[in-house]
Amino acid sequence: RDVAPSRGLGDVYKRQTLPQPLQALTTKAFAAAPKRAKRIVLISLDGICVAGFKQAKTPHLDALLAEGVLSTKTRVVMPSVTLPNWTSHLTGSGPEQHGVTDNAWTVSKHKLPAIEKDNEGYYPSIFSVLKEAMPQIKTAFYYNWGPLINPYNRRHLDEIGFLEKDAYIENYEKAFNFLIENQQSPTLVFLYSVHTDHAGHQHKWMSPEYIHSIEEADVEIGKLLDKMKQEGLYEDTHFMFLTDHGGIEYGHGGVSVDEMIVPWGITGPKIVKGLKIEEPNNTVNTASVILRLFRVDQPACWTGEIPSTIFK
């Protein structure tokens, strides 16, 4: 296990209240989530287009999202590539703020500086903001595409799990064990796989191989959910289903509907059940929703908003 120490950020990041228009937009969300979330699991698959999501046979994911909210009109940030969009999911901001404009970004080599950074050069992420506000929270990051972790300061991650060559099943097992070990603590788990994106690049988006890669992931999602149910962890957990872009032919990065519009979902306590939302949504909103569930204020530099219809 690659374990990093948990440390607070002190006064590294500045806080301020939401501007009046945003306060009005999210009044319902503030009122509807009085109790702090116990744990949040981010089920994250790379490169899932809406058509592929609909065509793939995913009974476990379908059953999960039927208990909550689903959007099939969520927009990604430009460019429609991996690192900018996952960074946007996990920092509540677009590339204009966090500065991750391509897949080659590193803390020491990039084109656009972030508008705000900690002492080590990292933009405030969901992990750093939560660790500052809730030192007791446990955070984990499981991934199988090397550059994915680059925008985040590892000292805010309690467990890191990296697998090579598109392997991901072991990370699902590690994530479950992490949830068991930390069931008495608030917990945030980012559980990611790139194999679905690579299937699109190698065989074409919407090819049988691409669809099969999504269905394979659903099997592991089902196993994780079943084990959580057996251990009594399912009912009080919030789950989010996330992706970063779609695809067309053998790639992505453009501005077509198939690349720019993706599925996005959330389920758990106080989340509306069986709702398909039509309101505007974007990858930058994910981290804002997570902070609201944990009852933590949003950094002033973030631009994410909370979809007003998702809470009961």
Question: Positions of the model-derived regions?
Answer:
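Single conserved hydrophobic/aromatic residue that forms the stacking wall/gate
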Residues: 1-16
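Active-site nucleophile/metal-coordination loop of metallo-enzymes that catalyze phosphate/sulfate
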Residues: 17-37, 49-129
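Loop/turn elements at helix/coil->beta-strand transitions in domains of secreted/extracellular proteins
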Residues: 36-40, 67-71, 133-140, 183-189, ...
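Metal-dependent active-site segment of extracytoplasmic phospho-/sulfohydrolases and closely related
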Residues: 41-42, 60, 216-257, 290
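Second-shell loop/turn segments in exported
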Residues: 47-52, 75-76, 87, 111-118, ...
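Substrate-binding rim/cap in mid-to-C-terminal beta-strand-loop elements of soluble/periplasmic
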Residues: 90, 255-297, 308-311
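Catalytic-site neighborhoods of secreted/periplasmic enzymes
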Residues: 98-101, 112-168
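Active-site His/acidic residue clusters
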Residues: 145-162, 173-219, 223
